[in-house]
Design a protein with these regions (language model features):
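Non-cytosolic coordination micro-motifs
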Residues: 3-54, 90-206
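Mid-chain, structured segments of secreted extracytoplasmic proteins
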Residues: 55-102
Length: 206
């Protein structure tokens, strides 16, 4: 059971989400790189976009296959430059985090080939961290692809409390898994020009 696959599609969500590799030359799912802020993207199976981050990004939520996600379209002074897909994770299921990363990475690799870079760091719950014997299982997974002019990065930062229970000391937001497509050609922010006023004359001070 591939939880990332659309019904009737043998590839995973990455394939169904991004389309053919050459699409990235133009934009993301038909939304062109450099499109100015104010244009509204439209993705199937997603909610209506809403502005966030002081209106410099659009956010929508929905499902990719069976996975709940939030998708952000982010704009710079040069226009649309990044899509960030944030996966919903079970805060107490460490193994499901690793499995989901592997599934998405596999789907991306079917489209773009093996990752250009990979990084894997895991740490089991060692020792006693406080008086109630709480520890943490941790994993940092990262893979990236270079699909010129676009960069693709997949990141998992998993931190799960052990022993598992319904009450997490640090809440349910310690783990994240994000998939990012970005075009460095549009990562441009206009520099604010600061006009410095000359210091007051010594005669004005004294």
């Amino acid at each position: 059971n591939d939880s990332l696959a659309w019904a009737g599609d043998s590839l995973g969500a990455a394939v169904d989400t991004i389309g053919p590799p050459l699409d990235l030359d133009y934009g993301y799912k038909g939304f062109m790189w450099g499109t100015p802020l104010g244009a509204i993207p439209n993705l199937q199976y997603m909610s209506k976009p809403v502005f966030i981050r002081d209106s410099t990004a659009l956010e929508m939520s929905g499902y990719l296959g069976q996975e709940a996600v939030v998708i952000e379209y982010v704009f710079s002074d040069s226009g649309f430059w990044k899509v960030e897909i944030k996966y919903a994770l079970d805060p107490s299921d460490y193994e499901s985090h690793l499995e989901l990363f592997t599934q998405v990475e596999r789907s991306l690799s079917e489209v773009y080939g093996f990752p250009q870079t990979t990084d894997r760091i895991e740490s089991g719950a060692m020792g006693v961290h406080d008086v109630v014997n709480i520890g943490f299982e941790r994993a940092f997974y990262f893979s990236s692809w270079n699909v010129s002019p676009v960069k693709i990065s997949l990141l998992l930062n998993s931190i799960v409390q052990v022993p598992k229970n319904d009450l997490n000391v640090f809440g349910d937001d310690m783990s994240i898994m994000n998939l990012v497509y970005y075009n460095p050609d549009y990562m441009i922010m206009a520099e604010e020009i600061i006009v410095e006023e000359p210091p007051p004359s010594i005669f004005d001070i004294y």
